[in-house]
Amino acid sequence: MNAELQTQPPSTALSALSSIPAAKPRASAPETAPTSSERHHGSRVSPNGAASVSLSVAVFDSHKYDSDPLKEACAKARQNPPPDKPPVSIELRFLESNLDVHTAALAKGCEAVCVFVNDKISEQVLQELKSLGVRLVALRCAGYNNVDLQAAKRLGIAVARVPEYSPHAIAEHAVALLLALNRKLVRATQRVRDGNFLLEGLVGFDLFGKTVGVVGTGKIGATFARIMHGFGCRLLASDPVRNEALAKELGLEYCDFPVLLEQSDIVSLHLPLTPESWHLINADSIGRLKRGATLINTGRGGLIETEALIAALKSGGVGAAGLDVYEEEEGVFFADHSGTVLTDEKLAWLLMCPNVLITAHQAFLTKEALQQLAVVTVRNLRALANGEVPGQADVDGQQWLAGF
C-alpha cells in the first residue's frame, strides 16, 4: 500500500451467486451486535440511552493484521461518538477473497465495502455493488488507481480513502531496503548461518557524501529526504510542485528529472501511479542513470518498466534494486505461493538476482500506520451512517474521491 501520501497535487511523470468461487468469510460482530432488523441504518438504544444507527460492511482481502485494528477502531468509535452525533454500530463481515466480478455478490446485505490495493473496483463490479444496495467504497489505503472513479460517480456510489497515515513507515522501509542492499545483509546473514564467516563479496559503500535523488517530495519523499540528510548525503529532488521549505531546511536541490538520474548514486521513487508516471523508469530514462546506481521503489510497481530494469541489472547500469512493489504484483503479493511454481519469469529472475531485494508491498506495515488506516476508514464509514457523505460538488479530491 505504498502510494505517495501527499496532500499537494500528485506528482506526474515529471514534465448470480452461483458463479462465485469458494470464499473464506470470517464474520465478526461489533462490540454490541445489532439484530437483523436493526441493520442498514436500523435504530436502537445505546447503553447511555442515546439512539444509535448501524451499518453492515463487507471487508474484502482481509487479514488479521488489518482486521484487528479495524475492530478496535469500530469499538472506540461507537463508545466515543461526536457530541452531536448518535453512536454508530458497524458490523464488519471479513472476507479473505479479493473484490472482483466473481466475488462482488458477497457484499449482499451490506451498504459499504471496505477494500485494499489489489481489489478490482471496475465499472462492472460497481454496477453489481449498486444493484446490491452498496453506497460506499471505503479504501483502507491511499492509492486508488484500482477504482473506476468515473463509473462510481455516474452510479452515485461514494468513494473514500485514507489520504495519509504514516509517511515514516514507508520512508523508513525505503531506507531499510537501501541499507540491506548496500551492506549485503541478506547474503551475510545466510553465510553466517551456514558457518561461512568470510567477508569476500560483502563490500558496501559509505552513504555519507553520496548523492541521493528523491523523485516526488510529498510527505513520504520529504520524510525519506530528512532521513538521508541525517546520513550526510547530498540531496537532489524532482517534483513539479516544489517544497521550498524542505529545500531550505535540508539544502535540497530541485532539478530536472534527467539531471537527477545522471548525478545520483541512489534514486528513490515516492510517487503515485498515474497515466503520466507509468513506466517513469524505462529503457530511455534508465539509460541516463549514473552507472552502478542503486534504485529504490516503495511507490507503485508500474513506475518501473520491469524489462528495462532487468536489462540494466544485467549490463551493470543499475548496481542494485530494492523493490517493495512490482509491476505485476497483482495475484502474487498478499498470498502464500510457497507450495507452487512461480510462473512469472521476470519476477523469478529478480528474486534470484543477488543485488535485488524484494519485499511484498509491506512498507506500510507498522502498528502506527495500521491504526491510522483503521481510524480514518471507520471515520469514512461513520460518515455514511450519519448522512455526511459529501455531494459531488463538495468532493475534496483527497479523502473523498466521489460523493452522492
Where are the language model's segments positioned?
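A short helix->loop->beta-strand "cap" motif at the edges of active sites that frequently abuts
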Residues: 131-135, 155-157, 233, 291-293, ...
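Short beta->alpha connector loops at strand-helix junctions that form conserved
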Residues: 116, 140-141, 157-168, 239, ...
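An N-terminal-biased, well-structured beta-alpha scaffold segment characteristic
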Residues: 2-159, 282
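Rossmann-like dinucleotide-binding domain for NAD(H)/NADP(H)
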Residues: 292, 299-404
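Rossmann-like dinucleotide/phosphate-binding beta-alpha-beta segment
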Residues: 200-291
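Phosphate-binding beta-alpha-beta segment of Rossmann-like dinucleotide-binding domains, i.e.
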Residues: 155-211, 223-226, 230, 396
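Short glycine-/small-residue-rich Rossmann-like dinucleotide-binding loops
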Residues: 117-118, 265, 271-273, 299-300, ...
